[in-house]
A protein has these predicted regions:
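Aromatic-capped interface at the extracytoplasmic side
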Residues: 31-45
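Hydrophobic membrane-insertion alpha-helices, especially the h-region
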Residues: 17-35
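Soluble "head" domains of membrane/secretory-pathway proteins
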Residues: 5-16, 35, 49-220
């Protein structure tokens, strides 16, 4: 009868309201994750001892949203360059020192899945060493910016910066790019191998470490 129809209608309405609430919550979560910030886990040892494997971080993505230029010393995450583009020979074009990305998406849905949902997207976490227009040199295990030695207190005392099998060790950083390296230089694949990272490929700045709790605080 009419009562049964009304009951079904009310039930359907409740279900629809729940579905709408879930969809809205999902969209809001995506927006916050993409534009403002998101948690992540350190998976590789390339930033040791500053960041250790399995530590939990909060990434600041607002800097990407407002297209803020990172500062030297900032720890950032960025889309990993195409792996088959890494150069291991010293024969390279000195005027072409930006990292290569060959998996650019053209369709809107593919862009959404890759950039927003981050399906099959690899990211690296490294420290910004040199900025646009700066002359970077690595010699005798040390880093020089515009002929001035860079003081790197975040490195372990015995660590030096090798250029073995690394073509990118004497270059001028292009406009809208940064040169990045891991703090654990012997265990880091970074700009020495794949070149400078375009600003448009930077995803976030490391902001807070929230695990382990005894190390909770801002990351420098």
């Amino acid at each position: 009868g009419d009562f049964t129809i009304m009951k079904l209608t009310d039930k359907t309405k409740d279900i629809l309201e729940w579905i709408i609430c879930i969809v809205i919550a999902f969209v809001l979560a995506l927006l916050v994750r993409y534009y403002i910030g998101t948690p992540t886990i350190v998976k590789m040892p390339s930033m040791y001892p500053t960041l250790k494997q399995d530590q939990r971080l909060i990434l600041n993505r607002w800097c990407r949203t407002i297209k803020e230029m990172p500062s030297r010393g900032d720890i950032i995450t960025f889309e990993a360059p195409t792996s088959d583009s890494y150069i291991f020979s010293k024969d390279f074009n000195p005027n072409d020192v930006a990292a290569k990305y060959s998996n650019e998406k053209t369709k809107a849905l593919d862009k959404f899945i890759y950039n927003v949902l981050e399906v099959n997207k690899a990211s690296y976490i490294k420290r910004v060493i040199a900025l646009p227009g700066e002359h970077l040199q690595i010699k005798d295990g040390k880093v020089y910016i515009n002929d001035v030695e860079l003081q790197e207190d975040y490195l372990q005392p015995q660590i030096t910066t090798s250029t073995e099998n690394c073509p990118f060790y004497d270059l001028v950083v292009p406009e809208n790019c940064v040169f990045v390296m891991g703090d654990n230089r012997p265990e880091s694949t970074d700009s020495r191998r794949f070149g400078c990272i375009p600003l448009e490929k930077i995803e976030s700045k490391v902001w807070i470490r929230f695990w382990p709790l005894n190390l909770f605080g801002k990351v420098n």
